[in-house]
């Protein structure tokens, strides 16, 4: 498409471009053909092309105004701290798929393509508490994502000789299972690709998810969620850890050997404190709730 314009000195030409994005994975596109999705996209473009930039801008402005009025955090102090919390809240808002429980939060958010948009333990430990306390309905959807992808966790446990649910270190689409790359960048010393061990032995994410479920339940008392999703995840992750433990006959105790803890620079660790404690907590918590439910 080409156009020619003759402008006089000082005259301004304004070009407005309207675009939208539709994918076959959108909830509204689940039962549509490619042609139907294309037509829906074009229909929307035709509709908004009749609106001015000001109308669309004000519509966007209203959405953000409602957000800040609803969830604004005010820090009494220097402006930098207020800017920092605003910056964090902005990214939490734009990178959270709050409309769709089939998606998790990408580790890099929308700031880059690092980790290919995969979800890590960052969601449950660092991000979820914000929503648990401010927007529990969004926190629930993020936890539902873990339930909807439990099939991949069960498959990973089985493939590794364990029972229950062993959650992937990196998660993507619901049926994908473990998506952590096996090989990374070339080591400048050896000249060979570096093996990425986290997908194999960084296993604390299984407990991280259960802890997040428990925390959400403690704050919201959402029994409906627990009965539909929470208890099942809790019990399956406890079963995994019970099968993962290694008995030491000499010392008469269990070990969890060959793991990576939160410090990813330390690989092949035996009895990492963080991993061990949360594994113990997961089993203990599951037993307590099992006994309560029996009553």
Task: Please report, for each region that a protein language model flagged, where it lies by residue.
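Acidic/polar, glycine-enriched structural segments that form the non-catalytic walls/loops
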Residues: 1-115
């Amino acid at each position: 498409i080409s156009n020619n314009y003759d402008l006089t000195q000082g005259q301004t030409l304004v070009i407005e471009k309207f675009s939208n994005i539709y994918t076959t994975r959108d909830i509204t596109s689940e039962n549509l053909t490619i042609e139907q999705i294309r037509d829906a996209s074009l229909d929307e473009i035709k509709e908004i092309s009749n609106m001015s930039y000001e109308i669309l801008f004000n519509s966007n402005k209203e959405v953000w105004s409602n957000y800040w009025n609803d969830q604004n955090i005010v820090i009494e102090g220097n402006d930098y701290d207020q800017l920092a919390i605003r910056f964090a809240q902005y990214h939490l808002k734009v990178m959270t798929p709050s409309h769709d429980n089939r998606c998790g939060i990408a580790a890099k958010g929308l700031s880059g393509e690092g980790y290919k948009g995969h979800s890590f333990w960052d969601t449950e430990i660092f991000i979820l508490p914000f929503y648990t306390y401010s927007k529990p309905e969004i926190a629930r959807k993020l936890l539902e994502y873990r339930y909807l992808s439990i099939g991949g966790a069960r498959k990973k446990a089985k493939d590794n000789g364990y029972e229950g649910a062993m959650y992937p270190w990196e998660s993507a689409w619901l049926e994908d299972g473990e998506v952590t790359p096996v090989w990374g960048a070339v080591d400048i010393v050896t000249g060979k690709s570096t093996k990425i061990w986290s997908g194999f032995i960084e296993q604390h994410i299984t407990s991280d998810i259960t802890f997040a479920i428990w925390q959400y339940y403690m704050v919201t008392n959402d029994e409906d969620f627990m009965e539909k999703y929470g208890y099942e995840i809790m019990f399956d992750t406890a079963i995994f850890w019970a099968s993962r433990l290694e008995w030491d006959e000499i010392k008469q105790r269990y070990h969890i050997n060959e793991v990576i803890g939160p410090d990813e620079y330390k690989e092949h660790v035996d009895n990492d404190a963080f991993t061990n404690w949360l594994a113990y907590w997961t089993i203990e918590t599951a037993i307590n709730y099992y006994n309560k439910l029996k009553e």
